[in-house]
Amino acid sequence: MLVKNLIIYAVSDSVGETAQQVAKACMSQFYVNETYEIKRFPYMINKGVLLETLENAKAENALIVYTLVDEELCSIVERYCEREGLSCIDLMTDILREISKRTGRKPKREAGIIRKLDESYFKRVEAIEFAVKYDDGKDPRGVLQADIILVGISRTSKTPLSMYLANKNIKVANVPLVPEIPIPKEVFEIDTKKIIGLTNSPEKLNEIRTQRLKALGLSSKANYANLERILQELDYSEEIMKRIGCPVINVSNKAIEETAGIILDIMKENGLKIYKEIEI
């Protein structure tokens, strides 16, 4: 199917520069009058985040170009794209296989091994590891150590935003708001300037959750995607955010980059330390 506005997802378990540059080099071979966009998704080391990225790619009918050295992650991309009819191009596996065949050696399969491990890079890795460790309220102690805390109900982009901000060396913890589960006391022990509330429209949540259930092979009639349940969760989250006194961002129809930009602006306005984005 021909598309007027081509979108390419450059997906990597490292920085993603290779996938992005290859995509740019290929695009330069065409006289493109129409607009196109290359979106880079680095550090795809979390299966859940990777799956969510693939779901977004499907929604945008994007071409996926990826440099993943982890065989399991490669398999996830291949299976998803085959099932959903998406086009994807693996830039590394065939080359690794041929080199292995000719040399008799096995690849290390370490993401980002070519990179220079300088201080800034280690800070970024630390922030990413922090985001993974304290994702989805796994350990409330992370709330006390984080530069910023995201709160919101399921499917309000907490995890992808945490990873995106981590790539700017910002340590982010996110806390899910569920009516049946008490919010960690640590949330009320920190400066509210560090907390950002996330919400979404009921219709969008219903759509996203239904797609999520389908991707997991579950019934779309589950309570998770029920509109009445969603409204209940939204009311609960609104009440909690008012108690906290934090700013709230509606992520409906917003790209991750756009929402992250709003968060960074709020951090600046609140006088919180902002880490300069590292150009790599």
Curated annotation (Swiss-Prot):
Entry keyword Isomerase: no
Keywords, alphabetical: Kinase, Nucleotide-binding, Serine/threonine-protein kinase, Transferase
Catalytic activity reported: N(tele)-phospho-L-histidyl/L-threonyl-[pyruvate, phosphate dikinase] + ADP = N(tele)-phospho-L-histidyl/O-phospho-L-threonyl-[pyruvate, phosphate dikinase] + AMP + H(+); N(tele)-phospho-L-histidyl/O-phospho-L-threonyl-[pyruvate, phosphate dikinase] + phosphate + H(+) = N(tele)-phospho-L-histidyl/L-threonyl-[pyruvate, phosphate dikinase] + diphosphate
EC annotation from Swiss-Prot or TrEMBL: 2.7.11.32, 2.7.4.27
Molecular function, one GO term: protein serine/threonine kinase activity
HAMAP family given in the database record: PDRP (MF_00921)
PANTHER family attached to this UniProt entry: PYRUVATE, PHOSPHATE DIKINASE REGULATORY PROTEIN 1, CHLOROPLASTIC
Name of the featured protein: Putative pyruvate, phosphate dikinase regulatory protein
Naturally occurring in which organism (per UniProt): Clostridioides difficile (strain 630)
